[in-house]
């Protein structure tokens, strides 16, 4: 009886493996990296590196439609430089009180200027257009934003800062566009650890 159960369990896993192998072939969305995904009204929205301000939409995280342009960078610090829509990296997005908020990082090291910032834009529609309420520099020397909403409703942003390597910081937010208090360092590379074997990460 025990042998019979083991055979049945093995067959079940084998069937599942075959099913997934047939239905999902990676990559499911070629050419997209360092992406953020938001679920809204039963659909998934993704944006990130190489999407150039576009979102892709899916019902199942496997089959994705054609790109939809949702944001064009328009601010004083990037205008006139090489930091265009192709520099929209590492998206994060969420909906709060009917407003959609989109964050991304710019990591541009061009001959004309260096621009390493986190940018925020918002829209009333999940597919934009997203507009930057602050056209000035929003946050210097930080990348890869992630906003977390706690159970009490408090918002926090987590991000990477270039400080002797990539250090992880957190900061409380007044609202999706403003901070409250000072940033707090949460993680940094320790000497002689794996994070420092090549370059500090």
Regions found by a protein language model. Give the residues of each.
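Bacterial Sec-dependent N-terminal signal peptides
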Residues: 1-22
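Carbohydrate-active catalytic/glycan-binding domains of CAZyme proteins
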Residues: 20-201
